[in-house]
Design a protein with these regions (language model features):
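Phosphate-binding loop of NTP-binding sites
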Residues: 2, 25-31, 48, 61-64, ...
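Nucleotide phosphate-binding/pyrophosphate-handling subdomain across enzymes
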Residues: 2-10, 18, 22-29, 176, ...
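Conserved N-terminal Rossmann-fold NAD(P)-binding element of oxidoreductases
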Residues: 9-14, 445
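NAD(P)-binding Rossmann-fold cofactor-contacting core
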Residues: 32-46
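Conserved beta-strand positions in the Rossmann-like core of class I SAM-dependent methyltransferases
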Residues: 34-35, 136, 388
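Beta-strand->loop->alpha-helix junctions that form or flank phosphate-binding loops
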Residues: 36-37, 55-58, 93-97, 138-139, ...
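C-terminal helical cap/extension that packs against the catalytic core
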Residues: 59, 378-438
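P-loop/Walker A phosphate-binding loop and immediately adjacent motor/lid segment at beta-alpha junctions
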Residues: 81-91, 207-212, 232, 344-353, ...
Length: 462
């Protein structure tokens, strides 16, 4: 069956960040698209306005008359639409397989990694847009100042974020693959086996054609080992001075950072200015720089992009300046939900605001991750002045480990840290009004529905 022979494509979980861009591409190419999700959101509303038939709630009737059903990694095998598609012998594929089909005919770039892939993909997309290459891109977050998470361009490049959480990125067939880092996340899928995680990343990179390029950060031991093992053409980057491209002379300012990228083979130095803060974002920019260079984009265009990049939604995003009982505070929102990401957030905020206290409102994400990385989370949260811990966001998991947010609070209090549990917005506000003394930073941190809390705090205190 050819893709051109397909009439109706149905998406289970169509409102998810990884699904909406693919669905939009298919609509723009003339396919009849339908999809279901548990709740209406901005993505489902947008797709409906473009012509997709949207169902709220999952029902076996929704997949009838479909030629193909696409599901995301968040969809459980017990989903009634999954079951119906199987019983009706409808072709059932993961989102990455559909994305792989769409990548054919493009010069494609895929960005993978445990952390930083959304920002890196966004930086690459912004550079290619400014270079007037009119790329198509599908990103797991929204570039601030831009309406959509996906754009269907007319150029030859397709830039995508690759999902390693369930190894579905192995379906992809890019010509340039980026790995920002490899860390101990999604180990529930990888059977708590880090070697299996490493080998899956290696397989992703080995899938490159012989004329392709792998771009890999070697600052972590795991990604460095994968780089050394890889047989495909490869380029390394990082703060490590042995990397093919390394960063030096990083200077953090209040609203931007400056650094140099050195090409090891020639010693050539490029001075860059980036609107994003934090060492982790300098690394993300280095990856984007190398990809843009591989595409032959002028250095001036790259510099212009970095200097004017608007940022990515929920990645150290400035929300508002607040007044809480007359005391000033700055509200920041961040998607990070792994200890490495929390550490990067805290370090970035401290480097730009060395004299301000930090209050982190943290919503742990998944019982499995909270249990496995509990000690690492506590080590990170010790570095903020006040922690407000919300209920763990289950993301559909059962609490087999019997872990509670009180475990976080009690562990922090044992370490003489200022920590609280909050059940709801009212309790959060009560704590903020008691604890915020003025000239502080409040960070809403997590991958669940904490963005709603952030928006509510903004509405109350702005």
């Amino acid at each position: 069956m050819k893709l051109s022979n397909i009439k109706r494509i149905h998406f289970i979980g169509i409102g998810g960040v990884g699904m909406v861009g693919i669905a939009e591409m298919l609509i723009n190419q003339g396919f009849n698209v339908s999809g279901s999700d548990l709740v209406k959101n901005k993505n489902t509303i947008r797709l409906n306005s473009l012509g997709a038939k949207i169902f709220i709630g999952h029902n076996e009737k929704n997949v009838r008359n479909s030629d193909v059903v696409v599901y995301s990694s968040a969809v459980n095998i017990s989903n009634p639409e999954m079951k119906a598609a199987k019983s009706l012998n409808i072709t059932l594929i993961p989102r990455a397989e559909m994305l792989s089909s769409l990548m054919r005919g493009f010069q494609s770039i895929a960005v993978a990694g445990s952390h930083g892939k959304t920002t890196t993909t966004s930086l690459i997309a912004d550079i290619f847009v400014r270079a007037k290459l009119d790329p198509t891109f599908i990103i797991g977050g929204k570039i601030l100042g831009q309406e959509n998470k996906s754009i269907l361009g007319t150029g030859e490049y397709l830039i995508v974020e690759a999902d390693e959480s369930d190894a579905s990125f192995l379906h992809l067939n890019p010509e340039i693959s980026v790995v920002t880092n490899i860390d101990n996340d999604h180990l529930d899928y990888y059977e708590n086996n880090l070697e299996k995680l490493d080998s899956t990343f290696l397989q992703f990179l080995e899938n490159l054609p012989f004329f392709g390029s792998a771009v890999i950060c070697i600052d972590s031991d795991r990604s460095k080992k994968v780089f050394e093992t890889l047989s495909r053409p490869k380029i390394s980057y990082g703060f490590d001075k042995k990397a093919d491209y390394f960063i030096k002379d990083l200077k953090q300012q209040a609203t931007f950072q400056k650094f140099k990228i050195i090409r090891n083979s020639t010693g050539k130095e490029i001075s860059l200015e980036l609107t994003l803060s934090g060492k982790h974002n300098a690394l993300n920019a280095a990856a984007a720089f190398i990809v843009a260079q591989k595409a032959g984009i002028n250095t001036k265009v790259i510099k212009d992009s970095f200097k004017n990049f608007g940022g990515v939604s929920r990645r150290l995003e400035f929300k508002a300046d607040l007044k809480i009982d007359g005391k000033s505070a700055t509200l920041i929102d961040d998607y990070g939900h792994h200890p490495t990401e929390l550490k990067a957030t805290i370090e970035a905020l401290k480097s730009t605001n060395p004299n301000k206290k930090i209050c982190m409102i943290f919503q742990p994400h998944r019982y499995s991750r909270s249990t496995l990385l509990f000690n690492e989370f506590i080590d990170c949260l010790r570095d903020v002045d006040t922690s407000i811990i919300l209920d763990i966001y289950s993301a559909g998991e059962q609490n087999l480990q019997k872990i509670s947010s009180y475990d976080f609070v009690n562990a922090l209090i044992e370490k003489k840290k200022n920590a609280f549990f909050a059940k709801n917005l009212k309790e959060i506000c009560k704590i903020l009004e008691s604890e915020i003394k003025g000239n502080e930073i409040i960070v809403t941190q997590g991958a669940g529905n904490i963005v709603d809390i952030s928006n509510s705090i903004k509405a109350i205190y702005k």
